[in-house]
Regions:
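Non-catalytic DNA-recognition/assembly elements of restriction-modification systems
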Residues: 1-61, 179, 183-223
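Juxtamembrane/interface motifs at transmembrane-helix termini
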Residues: 9, 69-72, 84, 167, ...
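Flexible, active-site-adjacent loop/turn segments at secondary-structure boundaries
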Residues: 20-26, 36-39, 60, 73, ...
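Sequence-specific dsDNA recognition surfaces
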Residues: 34-35, 48-66, 71-104, 125, ...
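Short, glycine-/Ser/Thr-/acidic-enriched flexible segments
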Residues: 55, 81-83, 112-113, 137-138, ...
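A short beta-sheet element
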Residues: 77, 96-154, 159-162, 169-173
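Short conserved micro-motifs at the rims of enzyme active sites and ligand-binding pockets
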Residues: 87-88, 119, 190
């Protein structure tokens, strides 16, 4: 089952709203500006490092012997974002930060690159995925960081796959310069984007259910 184009439209709309806020600064044109290393920004804003706003948490690496055909927890690997019907499992009890939970922001950084808001049950995530932690700020920064990183990935992708590989290290991402708006602007942006995120999650759930139904029907036909 292919995810319908409605999700592409939702992504495009969210990116357009992000650009309006944080690239063109359209709602803030009446405010004085100041010069920074990232160009002119509203004077009440600042520039900081990515790691000042959030942390990248590493997943766990697994030996083949640790990956089971069934078990208590699924193990989320990069490939599962593209072929969700092929899973490994684990019975291991790990530190809490080695699991992803509904609404966590995940960043695939090896071979295939992408950002995903987790839309499923408690799951172990693999070493080639970072979970983005917002303990330094607040959960409502998620939408800003999600779309900021999408923009950065798009820039690097235009330069070619090698450029993405060269820049997409943990320290490289942590040391990215990022505009830091006042917290009330982040809250306002969150409130603008969250309806699109929730709609996207509903579409993904429907696709998942249709995929599972198809697999069940095909399995019965074969047997």
């Amino acid at each position: 089952v292919v995810i319908p184009p409605v999700n592409d439209n939702l992504d495009s709309t969210m990116q357009a709203i992000y650009k309006n806020y944080f690239v063109d600064f359209t709602p803030f044109k009446s405010e004085p500006t100041c010069a920074t290393k990232l160009g002119e920004i509203p004077a009440s804003w600042s520039v900081c490092k990515f790691c000042d706003l959030c942390d990248l948490l590493n997943g766990r690496a697994y030996s083949q012997e640790e990956l089971l055909d069934s078990g208590k927890y699924r193990v989320l690997r990069v490939g599962n974002f593209f072929t969700k019907n092929s899973w490994y499992y684990s019975d291991m009890e790990l530190e809490d930060n080695k699991y992803c939970y509904p609404d966590d922001l995940l960043f695939c950084w090896s071979a295939s690159f992408g950002l995903y808001i987790w839309n499923d049950v408690k799951t172990i995530y693999h070493y080639h995925i970072w979970k983005i932690d917002f303990s330094k700020t607040a959960p409502y920064y998620r939408e800003y960081i999600f779309l900021y990183l999408k923009q950065e990935l798009n820039k690097l992708s235009k330069e070619g796959h090698g450029s993405v590989m060269a820049h997409l290290t943990k320290s490289g991402v942590e040391n990215l310069d990022i505009v830091s708006p006042p917290e009330e602007i982040i809250k306002q942006f969150h409130n603008s984007i969250i309806p699109f995120i929730e709609h996207k999650k509903l579409v993904e759930k429907e696709v998942q259910q249709l995929t599972e139904l198809r697999e069940s029907i095909l399995s019965k036909m074969v047997s």
